[in-house]
C-alpha cells in the first residue's frame, strides 16, 4: 500500500470537451524528490485530435527505491497512446503567483457546507469531489451576487467557463465538520475574471484549501467569451482584494 496525499494542482483548459467525446489521459513524471511526486498530464480528445486540458499535480508520498522505480517507469510509458504530442516541455508556465493562504475578513461568503457520510473518501475524510463541489456552488453564488443570476443567464443564453485554476490542499475535512467558503476577486479584466476561494473550518478558522480560478462569461450562441457587463464589474469591484 502506498500512502499519498495531493498537495496542489494546476490546470489549464485548452479546448471544449463535447458529449460522447473519446478522451485519453497521458501522464509524465516531472520529478520525484524528497517524497514528492510531480506529475504532468494531458487530457487528449481522440475524435477532435486536440488537447483539452493540461495538469500539473504535486503528490506527497513515501517511496522506497523499488516503488520509486516502478512509479517512474509506469508514468513514462508512451508507446500505447493515440496522442502524438508527448513533448510536455512546451506548456506555457504554470505560474502560481497569487494571494497568501490568509483569507480576507471582508470576503463574500459564497458557500456553507458540512461534511456528510456520502462526502467521505477511502480515508473517511471529505473527498476532493466534496471540496470541488463547494467550489462549483461558490462560483454560482458569486456570479449571482454580481448580477449573472439564473434568470439573466437563461434570458440571454449566457454561461461561464473556467480557463485555468490553481488549488492547494492544506488540511483534511472529517465527518461532521462545518465549512464556509470565503471569496474575493483578484483581477477584473475586460473579459476575464480571476477570483480566489478559501474553504475554512468554521470551528477553528483554519484554511482547508484555497483555489484561484480564471474564468469568463460565455455567449452560448456565439461560442465565445463576452465583455464583462458594467453592472457585474461594479459589484465585483467591491470584492476586489486591496480595493
Language-model segments: residues:
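HotDog/MaoC-like acyl-thioester-processing domains
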Residues: 13, 17-22, 28-99, 173-175, ...
Amino acid at each position: 500500500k502506498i500512502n499519498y496525499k495531493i498537495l496542489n494542482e494546476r490546470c489549464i483548459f485548452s479546448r471544449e470537451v463535447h458529449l460522447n467525446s473519446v478522451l485519453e489521459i497521458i501522464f509524465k513524471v516531472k520529478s520525484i524528490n524528497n517524497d514528492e511526486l510531480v506529475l504532468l498530464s494531458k487530457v487528449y480528445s481522440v475524435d477532435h485530435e486536440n488537447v483539452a486540458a493540461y495538469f500539473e499535480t504535486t503528490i506527497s508520498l513515501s517511496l522506497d527505491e523499488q516503488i520509486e522505480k516502478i512509479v517512474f517507469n509506469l508514468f513514462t510509458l508512451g508507446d500505447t497512446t493515440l496522442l502524438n504530442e508527448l513533448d510536455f516541455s512546451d506548456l506555457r508556465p504554470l505560474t502560481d503567483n497569487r494571494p497568501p493562504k490568509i483569507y480576507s475578513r471582508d470576503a463574500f461568503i459564497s458557500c456553507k457546507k458540512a461534511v456528510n457520510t456520502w462526502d467521505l473518501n477511502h480515508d473517511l475524510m471529505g473527498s476532493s469531489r466534496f471540496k470541488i463541489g463547494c467550489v462549483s456552488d461558490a462560483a454560482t453564488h458569486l456570479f449571482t451576487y454580481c448580477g449573472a443570476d439564473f434568470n439573466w443567464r437563461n434570458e440571454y443564453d449566457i454561461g461561464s467557463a473556467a480557463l485555468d485554476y490553481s488549488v492547494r490542499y492544506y488540511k483534511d475535512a472529517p465527518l461532521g465538520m462545518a465549512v464556509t467558503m470565503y471569496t474575493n476577486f483578484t483581477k477584473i479584466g475586460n473579459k476575464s475574471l480571476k477570483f480566489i476561494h478559501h474553504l475554512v473550518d468554521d470551528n477553528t478558522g483554519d484554511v482547508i484549501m484555497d483555489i484561484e480560478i480564471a474564468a469568463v462569461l460565455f455567449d452560448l450562441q456565439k461560442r465565445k467569451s463576452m465583455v464583462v457587463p458594467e453592472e457585474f464589474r461594479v459589484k465585483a469591484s467591491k470584492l476586489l482584494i486591496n480595493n
